[in-house]
Each structure stands twice: as structure tokens, then as C-alpha cells.
């Protein structure tokens, strides 16, 4: 009985903490919100430069001589809203559906009760009628686990760190009432994908869609501390945003599905380990820097390859170089003629 009472109390507290009312917010929507920020499309619309990824040094690496054909500006990318895309499930990838499944920046009206004047992510997906289909709304590149001088360039911009247990996930959405389900996909450093169901978008107006961990026990899960973990290097504890995924059932007649996303936040328990304060092991052995740099090198090479591959449809290029690249990227060691990050 006590456990049940505690669970009810936690539910009420977490509702107040994370699931705010959506109808009565005016300028209060600008105040600081709880949880760790994963993505804020209003911030990305204002200035995406902090998420810039420069791939220009990798063009000749993936295709010898291609730097004379590829424009340098095409190889500098960021998480700006215009760079996001919709990827339909294979069964729905007919030209008409692909052409009309797009993302676009959308300005919230000044009289809106929430996020007035902000520019957010607008999504339109065109599905076949009476067909079970899904689509992913994806960033322009995989979020790097390690990038920038400190390796933390993308923290709060698609990347979260030091995760022990995921408690809650919140997506602020404006829906037009379509019968479609929304999921959030994350990926850890081992390539494991995690799908979190946020529920239906069959409502009109603003809402905070929330996933809560059904296995999380408050005041117990957060207190479980294992100090038998070596201080350095720590095991993988980062997760990156992979995509939003929307799905519709075969019974739905609707084809057009439109909705808007303001931001994505998470609540989680953090890893608790004792800190080696006497010696800076990273400055001595550089395990994080070495593994992070190699991970970023591979990510940049693959992202560059994808972009050059798209250009290849418009420009005549020999087939052999692409096969050579595929073989090289799998076998080449980091120190062997790799471009600088």
C-alpha cells in the first residue's frame, strides 16, 4: 500500500515537474524548463553555426580529384532546419510521396500562447492511402559523439552524456489533429537503437508528449550506486538523437500529415563514479581524445561519401574510385593519410 501511495505521489510530482499545462502559457513559455535539452529548433533557427560540421578536407579522401568538382560550401553542413529531411519507408518511396514529404521552418504567430515568434520545425509527410507506412524525420548528418576542441560541440544539440537510467522524454509538439503516432529514436555509442513511443498526434494545438520509464522506481533507481567501475576510461555513456519517426495504420484514409516540433528534452539519472582528482589521466593517455577523433574521422568520411554520391548522379565520375573508398575506409588505420578534423 505504501509503495502504491509513493508511486501515485511520484506520478503527481513528475506531472507538475515535466508535463506542464499547454493552454494557459503566454510569455511563461520562455522560462527555463526542467530536464536536459537535446534539441531546440528555435535555437537552431536563430543560429545553427555552433553545429557546423566541415567536410571539405574529406572530399579528395573519398574521391581523388573530386575537390575540383565539388563546391566547398556544399561540404560545410549544420543542423539548420532547412537541412533536415524526411525518409519514407521503402514501400512508400514513390516519386510523388518523396517529393511532397518535406521539412520547413515555421514561424509561430505572435498571438500564440506558446513560443510566440519562434521559428520551429515544420513537417509534412505524404503517405499512400489505406497503407501501413512510416517515415523518419532526420538531421542532415549523424550527430558526432565527439567533436570540437573539448569533444562536446553537440552536447545539447542532439547529444546527451553521462547517462545511467532514462526517466522521461518530452517533445513539445503542435498538431493539426492527424491520426498518426510519434516516436523518438536514440542511438548509443555501440550502435544500439532505442525507440521511445510518444503516443498519438490526434489532437489539435500545443501539447507536451511524454514518455515515462515504466521500470523506473523513484528514490531507489537513483540511489543504486556501483563504485566498482574504474575511474578511467569510463564505458560508453553517451546517446545521440537519431530521428523522429511517425507511423500510420493501414486503416487510415488520410495521406497528408502535418505537425510541428519545438524542442526535445530528457530527464535521466547520471552515472555516479568517484573522480580521480590527483592525476589527470586523460592528459596522460588521451583515451577519449584518440577514440573520439577516430570516431569523428569515420563519421566525416561516410557523410562526405554520401554527399559526393548524390553529386555523382549529376556528374560523370568513374565507378572504381567509390569501390576503392569503401575498401579503404574499412581497412585504413587512423594515422595513414587521414585528413585532419
UniProtKB/Swiss-Prot annotation:
What is one GO cellular-component annotation here?
periplasmic flagellum
Question: Which biological process annotations from GO are given for this protein?
Answer: bacterial-type flagellum-dependent cell motility
Signal as a keyword of this entry, yes or no, is yes
- Compartment annotation: Periplasmic flagellum; Periplasm
Signal sequence residues: 1-19
Report the function annotation for this chain.
Component of the outer layer of the flagella.
UniProt protein name = Flagellar filament outer layer protein
Question: What's the name of its gene?
Answer: flaA
